[in-house]
Amino acid sequence: MGLAGAKNKRKLGNDPNNTKWSRNTDTFGQKILRAQGWQPGEYLGAKDAAHAEWHTEANTTHIRVTLKDDTLGLGAKRNNGDECTGLDAFQHLLGRLNGKSDEALEAEQKVRNDVKLSLYIQKKFGMMRFVKGGWLVGDQVKQTPDEEAEEIPDSTETSEAPEPAAVESKKRKADRRSDKEDDKLGKKEKKSKKRKAGSEGDVGGEGGQKEKDKKSKRRKTESDECEEPAVTPKTAESLDEASGASEAGNTKNEKKDKKRDKKEKKERRDKKEKKEKRRIEKAAAESGAETGDSISEEKKRKKKEATSEPSSAPTPTDSNSSTPTGSGYSTPIPTGSSRYLARSRFIAQKKMAFADSAALNQIFMIKS
């Protein structure tokens, strides 16, 4: 309705603290609780419950509800300007300037960090009191300082006990290794017996098999004695050939690089020569056009002077005078911006000077 609507005013003079609603006993909830056997001043819940002994006056007070009108977490409080941000860093800087030791500065910084952490925990989770787990479960603490002193020598005895155990474990490992070696020797003997039996059965190929066995034994002994192969003359020759081939390859690569450099230099020279030729041709064409125009204009001027009647001597004029109207020639003036705009202006001025006889007399310093 806006300003034209009915105005409902509430006066708080009768209830300035707004506690009338909490003292009202005629509400719907009060009636239901009384119907269930509850009376004002009693606790909620079963009277014979196991946790009834923990009930306090807090169970009789009202549940306080606050309106959450921000996006902060539950229990978070806004910064009302109580904390001065950057003060700890400033104090650290002052301590360094005053010549405090690093240990003292670290201790002060640790205290500041602990205070910050406690404030953060208090804002985030509220007040927290840590209790030992034994008390929560119901354990009983029986340990005393005398018992701790008695337990210390027992620990030394237990530390001495593992030494013989370690010796026994070493003996067992040695026995296992000896058993494994015996098994390997037995297997080798069996294999050698089988080979001998096969050699006796094959009468015709006894000599060949013996020679093969001897060769294989020689190869094994040579491989065991010398781990690295000896350098024979053949291997030395092969190494020399490989080195020579590598050197030849290097020389070939160098020659190829030189040829490439020469080709690149020639190409660059050819490009420069072509550019110079083009520039010279352009300059010659421009100069030829200018000379041709000037010659034709002079011829026409002489013909006109011969045919025209003798008149009074021409009055001297400025070099900047316009072109004569009767010449019949006009210099084209470029309208747009071009690359040779300044050049074209210079050429036009030259043409105007050649067309005007008075200007030519002034240029060649001839008195008429």
UniProtKB/Swiss-Prot annotation:
GO terms for cellular component: nucleolus. Residues 310-337 have a biased composition (Low complexity). GO terms for biological process: rRNA processing. GO terms for molecular function: nucleic acid binding. Residues 187-196, 257-277 have a biased composition (Basic residues). Keywords: Nucleus, Ribosome biogenesis, rRNA processing. This is Protein PXR1. Involved in rRNA-processing at A0, A1 and A2 sites and negatively regulates telomerase. Residues 1-24, 144-337 are annotated as: Disordered. SMART domains: G_patch. Disulfide bonds: none annotated. Residues 176-186 have a biased composition (Basic and acidic residues). Residues 15-24 have a biased composition (Polar residues). Belongs to the PINX1 family. PANTHER family: G PATCH DOMAIN CONTAINING PROTEIN, PROTEIN PXR1. Its main location: nucleus. Residues 25-79 form the G-patch domain.
